[in-house]
UniProtKB/Swiss-Prot annotation:
Site note Important for oligomerization, residues: H155
Region annotation Interaction with glycans from host GPI-anchor: where it falls in the sequence: 346-355
Biological role: Secreted, cytolytic toxin that forms pores in host membranes after proteolytic removal of a C-terminal propeptide, leading to destruction of the membrane permeability barrier and cell death. The pores are formed by transmembrane beta-strands and are approximately 3 nm in diameter.
Region (Interaction with host N-linked glycan): 68-84
Annotated S-S bridges: C42-C98, C182-C187
Known partners and oligomeric status: Homodimer in solution; homoheptamer in the host membrane. After binding to GPI-anchored proteins in target membranes and proteolytic removal of the C-terminal propeptide, the protein assembles into a heptameric pre-pore complex. A further conformation change leads to insertion into the host membrane.
Segment forming the signal sequence: 1-23
Protein name: Aerolysin-5
InterPro entries: Aerolysin-like_C, Aerolysin/haemolysin_CS, Aerolysn, APT_dom, APT_N_sf, CTDL_fold
Stretches the record annotates as Part of the transmembrane beta-barrel after proteolytic activation of the toxin and insertion into the host membrane: 256-288
SUPFAM superfamilies, alphabetized: Aerolisin/ETX pore-forming domain, C-type lectin-like
Xref: Gene3D superfamilies: Aerolysin/Pertussis toxin (APT), N-terminal domain, Proaerolysin, chain A, domain 2, Proaerolysin, chain A, domain 3
């Protein structure tokens, strides 16, 4: 008996440890099913939900129950209907709330970007809002699934068809055609879909270029310094460093006026193309069109440690070059915008979280693009739909129950599909750059060991010094120094 008690205790401890390894998982109300198979009996691939799970989505469960209904949970618990305020307590029932053994989280898929050809701003917007398959129908079905009335024209029986697109200030309005007669309550009050507040953000990783025209490099200057050893023993304990400046002059043109609206979110370096060395940085939070050229100068250095024979000098040389390059370029700009739905909600069912039945006029704006806030983010509301009280806008669980999970996933993926516009132009630059540092052959010193017309510097007592021609010292390229190991 003692052994059995110990074994039972060990199993309990083991079970507790296993439970502690896994954090609580969300329960998505749209996947709950009520089975009338008996106390704590579920269909294939389902299990009874626990008291804790039922408590986390109690309001959702109660809204799906009859007034006097009592339904079972796992481990001898029951949940009671609206008349009982959803009380959860020990008890028994002939039916059971169940949840999939392998639930589907149902994330909204991310589709590949919809690319719009380059053009000015109005061209880009026009192409987007007039695209029936990729824009008008997905946004129309979004309004329809949320419960907006009359999302279609008088000459079609289908959602998103016979739609008119009109310019409205800096934006656009999509609304069902109202010409001719219609039948139905308030059928002349078509739901409007307004698209406005467009913004464009450059994607540096989308860079492409066309045919490259590049000149051969041309020698501009040769900088030579001398490491001089006037002692009677070889010297190699010092680095010889040649300092010089590189420069880039660049310019770009923009094919269309959309570039004036495009901004750069983060600073980035212009991509390298060909063999011409460039160092160009594009500033952040600036209009793309405002950055059409400039010049940059960078101070660099190269070092080498020569072994200088006794009573000798060794030349250390670096050559400065220039080269020209030009080519057409293309970037993509991520397009974001506001999507405002305006109309009255259907009496027969709508997804506003309070589910009003008095056909109220309702305006709501979603932001399609970077996150702004909870109220305007479809993805945030969708992902948090399992938390009662967190999403105080649309009841996405209701839309799933009415239309199906896959239908909602596919439609929202199309609504949230990234949109990109092409930004094209021509780029040209002249770059001044350096080759590699080179060490020449030793040259015996003259009897007096002097280096005419030179700036000399002795380092320590070892007899090693540097000599730099004065004409090189006067210009920014070519300063030299020696440092010990």
């Amino acid at each position: 008996m003692q052994k059995l008690k110990i074994t039972g205790l060990s199993l309990i401890i083991s079970g507790l440890l296993m439970a502690q390894r896994h954090a609580a998982e969300p329960v998505y109300p749209d996947q709950l099913r009520l089975f009338s198979l008996g106390q704590e009996v579920c269909g294939d691939k389902y299990r009874p939900i626990t008291r804790e799970e039922a408590q986390s989505v109690k309001s959702n469960i109660v809204n799906m129950m009859g007034q006097w209904q009592i339904s079972g949970l796992a481990n001898g618990w029951v949940i009671m209907g609206p008349v009982y305020n959803g009380e959860i307590k020990p008890g028994s029932a002939s039916n059971t709330w169940c949840y999939p053994v392998n639930p589907v989280t149902g994330e909204i898929p991310t589709l590949s970007a919809l690319d719009i050809p380059d053009g000015d701003e109005v061209d880009v917007q026009w192409r987007l809002v007039h695209d029936s398959a990729n824009f008008i129908k997905p946004t129309s079905y979004l309004a329809h699934y949320l419960g907006y009335a009359w999302v279609g024209g008088n000459h079609s029986q289908y959602v998103g068809e016979d739609m008119d697109v009109t310019r409205d200030g800096d934006g656009w309005v999509i609304r069902g055609n109202n010409d001719g007669g219609c039948e139905g309550y308030r059928c002349g009050e078509k739901t409007a879909i307004k698209v406005s507040n467009f913004a464009y953000n450059l994607d540096p990783d989308s860079f492409k270029h066309g045919d490259v025209t590049q000149s051969d490099r041309q020698l501009v200057k040769t900088v030579v310094g001398w490491a001089i050893n006037d002692s009677y023993t070889p010297q190699s304990a010092y680095d010889v460093t040649l300092r010089y400046d590189t420069a880039t002059n660049w310019s770009k043109t923009n094919t269309y006026g959309l570039s004036e609206k495009v901004t750069t979110k983060n600073k980035f370096k212009w991509p390298l193309v060909g063999e011409t060395e460039l160092s160009i940085e594009i500033a952040a939070n600036q209009s793309w069109a405002s950055q059409n050229g400039g010049s940059t100068t960078t101070s660099l250095s190269q070092s080498v440690r020569p072994t200088v024979p006794a009573r000798s000098k060794i030349p250390v040389k670096i050559e400065l070059y220039k080269a020209d390059i030009s080519y057409p370029y293309e970037f993509k700009a991520d397009v974001s915008y506001d999507l405002t739905l305006s109309g009255f909600l259907r009496w027969g069912g709508n997804a506003w979280y309070t589910h009003p039945d008095n056909r109220p006029n309702w305006n709501h704006t979603f932001v399609i693009g970077p996150y702004k806030d909870k109220a305007s983010s479809i993805r945030y509301q969708w992902d948090k739909r399992y938390i009662p009280g967190e999403v105080k806008w649309w009841d996405w669980n209701w839309t799933i129950q009415q239309n199906g999970l896959s239908t909602m996933q596919n439609n929202l993926a199309r609504v949230l599909r990234p949109v990109r516009a092409g930004i094209t132009g021509d780029f040209s630059a002249e770059s001044q750059f350096a080759g590699n540092i080179e060490i020449g052959a030793p040259v015996p010193l003259a009897a007096d060991g002097k280096a005419p017309r030179a700036l000399s510097a002795r380092r320590g007592e070892q007899g090693l010094r540097l000599a730099i021609p004065l004409e090189c010292r006067k210009s920014s390229p070519g300063l030299a120094s020696a440092t010990s190991a």
